[in-house]
């Protein structure tokens, strides 16, 4: 989510630079660090503890949460913080891991898990993608096209499920243009310079050095692609659970994952193509 207009002196409006993964310098996007944590610290009423790997939520004899036990990642020692209220916001799987690791007499199956569903109904987005190149765009003049992408071109779901053999839906995202190169840009060049001439020259696939740099510049901005991102059906049998034998480097039991796509997700992905 982005801000389309300035709301205060702390956050500005999105300028559509398209580099959200590099963090937003005007705080126009939503992220917990800039929108929640930073303003909270500025109040002077919040202590932020970094390098803390939460182990479990501590409870009293009545089974009520009393604080958190964590391992300091720098000295590998365990510490405890007492609290009147404990809120977990550790993402889907890590929150489930904390709850399942927080066993006690009152909570033998893990905290807040009397229903037995913590960790179950785990699902992700479905997806299928395709890409290609437009030869007419080879070697073109450089422009700043950082904003081109999902922010500008998007196809929402509009089909009638009654006429399809799967539930839910998906949207389609598009990408391409001369966006700012990131890590890995230009890799796989053997699939390009072995098929198309570069500035009128036929080359072998691959290459290195000055010739490879020429090829990367020549093909830059000619790639286009589209990808479908859909909604899966939550099912009880798809789950994460605590591994009884494996712990991480801090001695905290890790998660096992048991998930697979149903025929609905497979049919949805085929429909995307």
Task: Name each model feature, range by range.
Residues 115-266, 270:
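FAD cofactor-binding and catalytic pocket of flavoenzymes
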Residues 10, 23-30, 88-89, 112, ...:
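Hydrophobic alpha-helical scaffolding
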Residues 37-38, 119, 273:
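Short amphipathic alpha-helical segments and helix-helix/interface helices
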Residues 18-24, 82, 253-263:
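Glycine- and acidic
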């Amino acid at each position: 989510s982005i801000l389309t207009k300035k709301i205060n002196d702390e956050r500005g409006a999105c300028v559509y630079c398209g580099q959200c993964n590099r963090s937003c310098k005007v705080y126009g996007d939503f992220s917990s660090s800039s929108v929640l944590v930073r303003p909270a610290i500025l109040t002077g009423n919040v202590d932020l503890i970094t390098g803390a790997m939460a182990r479990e939520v501590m409870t009293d004899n009545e089974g009520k949460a009393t604080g958190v036990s964590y391992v300091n990642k720098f000295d590998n020692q365990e510490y405890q913080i007492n609290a009147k209220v404990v809120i977990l916001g550790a993402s889907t799987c890590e929150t489930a891991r904390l709850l399942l690791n927080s066993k006690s007499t009152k909570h033998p199956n893990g905290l807040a898990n009397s229903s037995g569903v913590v960790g179950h109904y785990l699902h992700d987005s479905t997806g299928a993608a395709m890409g290609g190149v437009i030869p007419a765009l080879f070697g073109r003049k450089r422009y700043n096209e950082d904003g081109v992408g999902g922010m500008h071109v998007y196809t929402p779901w509009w089909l009638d499920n009654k006429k399809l053999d799967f539930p839910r839906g998906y949207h389609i995202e598009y990408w391409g243009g001369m966006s700012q190169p990131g890590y890995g840009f230009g890799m796989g060049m053997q699939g390009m310079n072995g098929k198309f001439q570069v500035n009128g020259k036929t080359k072998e696939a691959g290459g290195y050095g000055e010739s490879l740099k020429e090829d990367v510049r020549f093909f830059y901005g000619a790639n286009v692609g589209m990808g479908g991102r859909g909604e899966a059906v939550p099912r009880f049998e798809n789950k994460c659970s605590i591994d009884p034998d494996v712990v991480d480097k801090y001695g905290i039991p890790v998660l096992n994952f048991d998930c697979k796509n149903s025929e609905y997700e497979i049919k949805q992905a085929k429909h995307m193509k």
